[in-house]
Design a protein with these regions (language model features):
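Carbohydrate-active catalytic/glycan-binding domains of CAZyme proteins
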Residues: 1-298
Length: 298
């Protein structure tokens, strides 16, 4: 299918990774981020590396393949583990009064879109939602991931690796969950949930918050910078809280000029709907951050 600017092609008739792929990964498969292994990576497991998580898991999973279509093999030990992430490693306790107070605040903000797993979100120690990039200058793989920093406070950290398997977490936290990062005009930028933008000079320290676009129901996203008719644009593929079946939307953001003036271009367009068989889709080839892997977790 197309939306006038992007052609979407389904590849295969099943997800590339499922709970049947290996018992170590569990049944909740969340947040895949795929890179092409750079030439300088020593003894890569495969040409492509896929980092993903259980949304309340204790380590970042890792799969590898020599073709984007697969077959994909699970690297059973995974990559970064909770104990080495810098985040809380034990679940927190919460009393009924505090839970009700927090639930009321969420209900006032989100209405009937209140998360089903709100209690787990508030107290469960975990790491999830990796966003992985190749830093050729430093010859490092850079991972943005989130975890539980305090009661109800999920934050993003950076972890780095020289072999694509073993990661070292850095101490600083940078913002809320679901950082999706991109480079533009001498800065590293991050789009976090829901539609909040951050920036840093080096992409590893000192992220500052700027504008917010989209709406409060924006959830997961993937981003890339493209050249539009009037200058640089950010192409955003994203999902929306409450959509059933889940669908992937595409939005365009003008990022020409100061970020205070960034703005959405037109209305979001649906490019994929979960009503069809769930599988991998190829949108386009991006250097290192390759074809977007889209699968709907049950």
């Amino acid at each position: 299918m197309t939306d006038g600017g992007v052609q979407v092609e389904r590849v295969g008739d099943a997800p590339i990774i499922t709970p049947a792929s290996h018992p170590s990964i569990g049944t909740n498969i969340q947040g895949p981020s795929v890179i092409r292994a750079p030439a300088w990576l020593p003894d890569p497991l495969g040409r492509y590396l896929c980092y993903f998580a259980d949304h309340k898991g204790s380590f970042i999973r890792l799969a590898y393949a020599d073709a984007i279509e697969g077959p994909w093999t699970i690297h059973e030990p995974g990559s970064l583990h909770l104990a080495d992430s810098g985040f809380l490693v034990e679940d927190l306790a919460i009393d009924a009064e505090t839970l009700e107070r927090i639930t009321s605040r969420y209900r006032a903000a989100l209405g009937d879109q209140l998360p089903v797993s709100l209690l787990d979100d508030l107290v469960t120690a975990h790491i999830a939602s990796p966003d992985v990039h190749v830093d050729d200058d430093r010859r490092e793989i850079v991972m943005y991931l989130h975890g539980l920093e305090a009661l109800g406070d999920q934050r993003t950290r950076v972890a780095v690796s020289t072999d694509g398997i073993h990661f070292r977490a850095t101490p600083e936290t940078h913002g809320p969950s679901y950082f999706r990062c991109f480079r533009h005009d001498g800065w590293w930028y991050a789009l976090a949930m829901p539609g909040r933008f951050f920036r840093s000079r080096d992409g590893r320290t000192g992220f500052e918050e700027g504008l917010t676009l989209f709406g409060p129901d924006m959830r997961h996203s993937a981003v890339r910078v493209v050249e539009g008719a009037t200058g640089a644009e950010l192409e955003v593929f994203w999902t929306r809280v409450g959509d059933a079946p889940e669908r992937i939307l595409r939005s365009r953001v003008s990022i020409a000029g100061p970020w205070e003036r960034w703005c959405e271009i037109g209305e979001p367009v649906e490019v994929l709907c979960g009503a069809a068989p769930q599988s991998m889709v190829r949108l386009t080839s991006w250097p290192y951050e390759v074809e977007l892997v889209a699968q709907r977790a049950a």
